[in-house]
Amino acid sequence: MKEKSEEKRVAELFLHLTGIDNASLKEREMADAVEAILDELEIPYTEDDTWKKTGGNAGNIFAKLEGEGEPMLLCAHLDSVAPALGKKAVWKEDGTITSSGDTVLGADDLAGVAEILETLRRLKERNIPHRPIEVLFTYAEELYDVGSEFFDFSQIGSKEAYVLDASGCTGTFLYKAPTIVSFEVQIRGLASHAGFQPEKASMRSRLRRMRSEASRWDMWRKIRRSMSGRSPAVRGRISCRSAAR
């Protein structure tokens, strides 16, 4: 009966969270709901003010639950893709939870948020021995990780992290995935018309050569080494734009 009541509790928590507006850069109400639960569990946390740099209204929430041994990090994001305003979650008779049909449900990533909060609750209620748990709830993840981009990662002591933000079978996890690499290149050259004097300073031919070189796997490996993290870039997905000035 205890496990059954815990299952119902986490479902009710998920239902509660998915009924809260959480558009990117408008996560204030969601952040307040999460912080209220952390207060209830007496788990200390801080919320940064990086939203001032991004035009949002809520920051990244970082919490710690003390334990023994090496720390580990649990992470999820507070926002959902649009439309995520005016949400209303519906718990159907068959046990499924859906949106009302006019907005997204927001399971991405409120399922992860609910799982982390319920994990913290169970650890405390059952007095289960555990490692130190660091928790990071980021904002504006759906806008190419704007929130986490400004987070002060020096606060994190964990070398092991689980980001609860993927679909799949229970008990499975992803350990790598493609990523997006954007860079801007400025090329200074001589004024020249490609139709009359291509041999002098044709930018098109130079851009074509640059694109060809950049698409080679060896260069991608160099780019990957200069990046933080281990996500491999997608080979050949490079575009170049130029303008005559």
Q: How would you label these PLM feature ranges?
A:
Residues 103-178, 220, 225-233, 237-238:
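Acidic/histidine-rich catalytic neighborhood of metal-dependent amide-processing enzymes
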Residues 197-231, 237-239:
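Acidic-enriched catalytic cores of C-N bond-cleaving enzymes acting on peptides and small amides
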Residues 16, 117-124, 210-216:
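Short glycine/serine- and small hydrophobic-enriched flexible loop segments
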Residues 116, 161-197, 201-211:
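Phosphate/diphosphate-binding glycine-rich loops and adjacent basic-rich segments that engage nucleotide
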Residues 31, 37, 56-57, 64, ...:
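Active-site metal-coordination/substrate-binding segment of hydrolases
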Residues 2-28:
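N-terminal capping segment at the start of a domain
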Residues 98-107, 192-197, 234:
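A short glycine/serine-rich beta->alpha loop
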